[in-house]
UniProtKB/Swiss-Prot annotation:
GO terms for cellular component: mitochondrial intermembrane space; mitochondrial outer membrane; nuclear speck. This is F-box/LRR-repeat protein 4. It comes from Mus musculus. PANTHER family: F-BOX_LRR-REPEAT PROTEIN 4, PARTNER OF PAIRED, ISOFORM B-RELATED. Its main location: cytoplasm. The modification Asymmetric dimethylarginine is found at R28. Residues 277-332 form the F-box domain. SUPFAM superfamilies: F-box domain (SSF81383), RNI-like (SSF52047).
Amino acid sequence: MSPVFPMLTVLTMFYYMCLRRRARTATRGDMMNSHRTIVSNSRTSPLNAEVVQYAKEVVDFSSHYGSENSMSYTMWNLAGVPNVFPSSGDFTQTAVFRTYGTWWDQCPSASLPFRRTPSSFQSQDYVELTFEQQVYPTAVHVLETYHPGAVIRILACSANPYSPNPPAEVRWEILWSERPMKVNASQARQFKPCIKQINFPTNLIRLEVNSSLLDYYTELDAVVLHGTKDKPLLSLKTALVDMNDLEDDDYEEKDGCEMDALNKKFSSAALGDGPHNGYFDKLPYELIQLILNHLSLPDLCRLAQTCRLLHQHCCDPLQYIHLNLQPYWARLDDTSLEFLQARCVLVQWLNLSWTGNRGFISVSGFSRFLKVCGSELVRLELSCSHFLNDTCLEVISEMCPNLQDLNLSSCDKLPPQAFGHIAKLCSLKRLVLYRTKVEQTALLSILNFCAELQHLSLGSCVMIEDYDVIASMIGAKCKNLRTLDLWRCKNITENGIAELASGCVLLEELDLGWCPTLQSSTGCFVRLARQLPNLQKLFLTANRSVCDTDIEELASNCTRLQQLDILGTRMVSPASLRKLLESCKDLSLLDVSFCSQIDNKAVLELNASFPKVFIKKSFTQ
């Protein structure tokens, strides 16, 4: 062969690698330019005119800043035409998620991360929206009005939520994805990422967000879906751009699609003996296990196919002590659980958050899995798992006697009677019931029997009639409680606070944000400061009665304080905040948004004196 041919091959490979590198390192701006290229090369004929539509309805979401019975700061604001755009600033008519930055990860209530979570999975929250007409998407525009840059993934679903007949198959496809990236723009923007063409029409779009790099809450105003009724024909140039995007190994659906193959890979017994296994059999069994601990679940599936020795190691139940299935929510189903079942008999941490919706996991499939794999479970994450019902919680209570950590956050379809089963889990130390329909009777039973609770989240639990009764029971029974979330509890008073403060003296974190019935004039906040010296986080968000006396008591008694939110108070002066900052050396977050006495000049002066403290002051244009 002529020497020129290998040289041509090398040059061709180098050129291809450059193309891939260029696609991987493209900025959002480059992608938007790429989007314009695609649009210009896929012009539709009049017979296939583009349909432009705003979201008709918000059908599911993981969290929001607002309450369950109003529209302010709720995800439901994403339905319909924009309310705020193109204005910028903090507006109640927008959709806002519950958290931002890394502040919640630094709190005493934060859970440890799961091992084996693929680096490509960075989503923290999601919202799903439906549209009137099914179309082949050509563009998805997100109107961001405050602290943009949280959206990191956009998906489309093949199921039509408005169809009277359930589909035989439900598919999710990633239209666009990117790792979290700091966006310097502070003004409102219309985010227009370059999306991938898919081969089915959709009217169900899902946005996934990561707010860890944001300086404050992101606010979304509307979502616009562009598409055609018939599948568009793209030019060769467009196809090349899309292919480069699809081949980006850093953040694509490769791992997300592995659950399709997972069922086959683990069940395959037709492994060739082969003459060699790379001398792995010379290594101690424990060392191989330690090495394999660093592999993601899909990589473990792939490795299991290489030789019998590694198949044995990859199927060892010790590899599944911690099992995080949340990254694979779009593909995980009953069959997946069935093939994982034999390998999960020793599982202690299990994350099924976001999984099983739209029929992917059945009650019987979940029950079968737990009956085999539940005996050793210590931690079970089930956030937004809408397949759960009364039977599922009964199975959890019977099959998981060692359970210490249960997260049912945003399982808002669980019937109230289901929560009574939780009282049987007497070893519970952490219970998250945020945005659930737990009722007072069931909760009182839980508190009575689960006396070892250390972390309890009751944020936005709207079915509880009297939070004073709940607070009294917490104070009487939960002496080891360290963190308590009462965000937007509607009727707690100074009486409940008194019982809580006297009974739970170990509290390190207390969220009383948007609790309108608490009044500083009753002395409730002074009592908290004097009786809870270990407080590290205190949120008194939107309580307009918080005053200088309360702040000064915190400065005198709660010197370990790290995070304080007093958004919306009219009664706090810069002088009292200075005392607080001087006394609380560990304070790192202070939110004084909409505090009428704390103007921008005061914030600048405090920032200059205490540069290590992040002082937040929101604004409305």
